[in-house]
Amino acid sequence: MAMVVGAWRDPQDDVPGAQGTQPAPAPPVQGPPAGTPHTPQTPGPGGPPSTPAQSNAASQQSQGDKQQQQQHIECVVCGDKSSGKHYGQFTCEGCKSFFKRSVRRNLSYTCRANRNCPIDQHHRNQCQYCRLKKCLKVGMRREAVQRGRMPPTQPTHGQFALTNGDPLNCHSYLSGYISLLLRAEPYPTSRFGSQCMQPNNIMGIENICELAARMLFSAVEWARNIPFFPDLQITDQVALLRLTWSELFVLNAAQCSMPLHVAPLLAAAGLHASPMSADRVVAFMDHIRIFQEQVEKLKALHVDSAEYSCLKAIVLFTSDACGLSDVAHVESLQEKSQCALEEYVRSQYPNQPTRFGKLLLRLPSLRTVSSSVIEQLFFVRLVGKTPIETLIRDMLLSGSSFNWPYMSIQ
């Protein structure tokens, strides 16, 4: 098939009668001689010139030859009969329409096999992922589609999906992606209450636990509404959130300036009511200190809401989760989120060339905050011994993040 592409890159170059070639006149049948019979292109002085009818006949014959030859051109994607050159390559109408629709809508496809499905006339509709992959591989050009008139509609969540795992590296596209991340945030500052934004305010035990529950719910609800995540298999969604919920919790705590005073935290964990050895108390307080340090380091960078959204997306889309059905796809989503953050920081903070690196360097240390400590500090009073991972799974499977059985979240 590749040989066909090379042979028909410009069909006019190989067709008789193309531009620059004068059709030979028909040899005279009657009348005086019109020059030597071996050189009909240069008739003698007495020879009659070509008539319009003869030229028209030659042109029609040439056009017919071109049409006949073009009918034998195969679609470089599926091998069906080509209808012409579309977006840089000869394709059939079906592959042309499929490619245009996929690029204009930025549709995301998933291969259920090994990303190497056969694409021919009989199988081209069985795997959209591999069909689009082949369209790009044979040289169909995205930019040729995007130069066309775009529908004047507001982009929706699905319109910012990846194609073939490759992000569209343009500023407007990444800006749109960040806008959708921000739009998915279910928790404006006011939702957590005024106490959250008052670092010097010492919150009561009940308020601390309620705030923690709100932040956990918000992390799950945000993930359910950002681009790409809802398109993943539910098992992958559960695996990603079960691994990263504690890191998202720390980012949310920093974003809302959650007060982290030691005494209320120890009381919330119930440590004041149960006897503990001195060593265990010291170890637990060390965990609290690590939590406090991570939050303070993020607050010191004055991270804005767009940066927080990108950081959370980078954390969420991690290929470290066990049992992912498509590791490469999740990696591409993380890379896309990282590119969006880099583009945003470069445009919004041009005088801080090291800002992007500083933000990324904060992420690995988030895992130093023990998830079991977060559970004991904030959730043991609400859910007892029920693992947070189980609650996250139930929230995703139920389709609602705000069905907490132990308290009412307004």
Swiss-Prot record:
The lineage of its organism: Eukaryota, Metazoa, Chordata, Craniata, Vertebrata. Ligand-activated transcription factor. Activated by high concentrations of 9-cis-retinoic acid and all-trans-retinoic acid, but not by dexamethasone, cortisol or progesterone (in vitro). May be involved in motor neuron development. It comes from Gallus gallus (Chicken). Residues 52-68 have a biased composition (Low complexity). GO terms for cellular component: nucleus. Pfam families: Hormone_recep, zf-C4. It comes from the Eukaryota. This is COUP transcription factor 2. Binds DNA as a homodimer. Keywords: Activator, DNA-binding, Metal-binding, Nucleus, Receptor, Transcription, Transcription regulation, Zinc, Zinc-finger. The gene is NR2F2. Its main location: nucleus. One of its GO terms (biological process) is cell differentiation. Residues 1-68 are annotated as: Disordered. A zinc finger (NR C4-type) spans 75-95, 111-135.
